[in-house]
């Protein structure tokens, strides 16, 4: 018998790679009439939460790693304070289920849920599971994953699940603007790894534009990106462009792009598959190499793009890869590979998986 879920709490925080799937889960559960509360660190003023009517509570946390004694004490104090506040919020909200989306930001909430014996589920977005998700999988009822190969890494039932994508309009001014150019290129570095792309990609694209005078670049520079400097590079190079810190209509940008140059976070990977957008992936070298594994999956398993490691990155290497990626036959083959893979992905929703496991 499938149990009715009335309330869920989502343990989340950190980068968009954790926030975006949490918001997609929230949307899916809200459509089922479920009351949803987000709990985690870094939610105040998070760009992914702007303009959304989201019920959330900020929960302190600390990174439980080796550090100087003073730093370690401060982090453990934040972690303990977060645990106490999370336990209080869970008592008030009284959810049927707590879902963790990885990162240490979710740790206090998962600890509190375990203490209160609230059923825990997890969602893993990457090909290499994060430490918090691996740790709590032994206590969880189940883990929903974005990509099937990662299911073998957990100590509880796991299933590839689908999440709804970010909302987008079929009549988008962005789509209309990009449709008037060819080729169209999207550059996106993510919420934390944009600087390297901001420093290298514009110069390479100015070189590429010599062969493609009608090229258009939609460059998402990230919250700390120097938008004005990037605009100057494109302007001096005679490239048509739009440069901004953040993009709310991301799906229309991807749908309208002939090529995406990006980091290899799980969210962008999932959206590239959905939009069937060929990509050049430059994985962020930190975080235990999970982005490199994500990139290898899209490039070598699926055949949807190419990969450049950051240590190999140069204007010459980028220019060569971009010119190859813009070849019409290359675009056609990579789109077909992405389409074939996406059509065979599991269609089971995370909501359905959780209901079945309870």
UniProtKB/Swiss-Prot annotation:
Annotated binding of UDP-N-acetyl-alpha-D-glucosamine, by residue: 15-17, 126, 191, 291
Gene Ontology molecular function terms on file: UDP-N-acetyl-D-glucosamine:N-acetylmuramoyl-L-alanyl-D-glutamyl-meso-2,6-diaminopimelyl-D-alanyl-D-alanine-diphosphoundecaprenol 4-beta-N-acetylglucosaminlytransferase activity; undecaprenyldiphospho-muramoylpentapeptide beta-N-acetylglucosaminyltransferase activity
One GO cellular component, as annotated: plasma membrane
UniProt-listed Enzyme Commission number(s): 2.4.1.227
UniProt-annotated location(s): Cell inner membrane
Membrane topology: Peripheral membrane protein
Keywords: Cell cycle, Cell division, Cell inner membrane, Cell membrane, Cell shape, Cell wall biogenesis/degradation, Glycosyltransferase, Membrane, Peptidoglycan synthesis, Transferase
Membership in a protein family: Belongs to the glycosyltransferase 28 family. MurG subfamily.
Function per UniProt: Cell wall formation. Catalyzes the transfer of a GlcNAc subunit on undecaprenyl-pyrophosphoryl-MurNAc-pentapeptide (lipid intermediate I) to form undecaprenyl-pyrophosphoryl-MurNAc-(pentapeptide)GlcNAc (lipid intermediate II).
PANTHER family: GLYCOSYLTRANSFERASE (PTHR21015:SF22), UDP-N-ACETYLGLUCOSAMINE--N-ACETYLMURAMYL-(PENTAPEPTIDE) PYROPHOSPHORYL-UNDECAPRENOL N-ACETYLGLUCOSAMINE TRANSFERASE 1 (PTHR21015)
Name this polypeptide is given: UDP-N-acetylglucosamine--N-acetylmuramyl-(pentapeptide) pyrophosphoryl-undecaprenol N-acetylglucosamine transferase
Gene: murG
């Amino acid at each position: 018998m499938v149990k009715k879920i009335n309330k869920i709490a989502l343990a989340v925080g950190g980068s968009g790679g954790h926030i975006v799937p949490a918001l997609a889960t929230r949307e899916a559960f809200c459509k089922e009439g479920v009351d949803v509360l987000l709990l985690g660190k870094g939610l105040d003023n998070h760009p992914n939460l702007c303009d959304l009517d989201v019920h959330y509570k900020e929960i302190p946390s600390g990174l439980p790693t080796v550090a100087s004694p003073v730093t370690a004490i401060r982090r453990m104090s934040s972690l303990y304070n977060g645990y106490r506040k999370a336990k209080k919020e869970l008592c008030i909200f009284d959810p049927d289920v707590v879902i963790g989306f990885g990162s240490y930001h979710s740790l206090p909430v998962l600890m509190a849920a375990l203490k209160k014996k609230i059923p825990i589920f997890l969602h893993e977005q990457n090909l290499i599971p994060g430490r918090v998700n691996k740790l709590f999988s032994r206590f969880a009822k189940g883990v929903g994953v974005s990509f099937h190969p990662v299911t073998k890494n957990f100590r509880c039932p796991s299933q590839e699940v689908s999440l709804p994508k970010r909302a987008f309009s079929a009549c988008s001014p962005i789509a209309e603007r990009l449709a008037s150019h060819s080729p169209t290129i999207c550059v996106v570095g993510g919420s934390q790894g944009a600087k390297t792309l901001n420093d290298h990609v514009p110069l390479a694209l100015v070189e590429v534009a010599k062969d493609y005078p009608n090229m258009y670049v939609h460059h998402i520079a990230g919250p700390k990106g120097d938008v004005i400097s990037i605009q100057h590079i494109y302007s001096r190079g005679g490239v048509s462009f739009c440069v901004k810190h953040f993009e709310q209509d991301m799906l229309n940008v991807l749908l309208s792009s002939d090529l995406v140059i990006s980091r290899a976070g799980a969210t962008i990977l999932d959206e590239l598959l959905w939009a069937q957008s060929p990509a050049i992936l430059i994985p962020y070298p930190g975080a235990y190499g999970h982005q490199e594994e994500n990139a290898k999956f899209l490039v070598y398993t699926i055949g949807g793009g190419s990969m450049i490691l950051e240590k190999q990155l140069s204007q010459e290497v980028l220019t060569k890869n971009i010119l190859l990626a813009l070849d019409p036959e290359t675009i056609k083959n990579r789109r077909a590979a992405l389409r074939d893979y996406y059509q065979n992905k599991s269609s089971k929703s995370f909501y359905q998986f959780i209901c079945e496991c309870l």
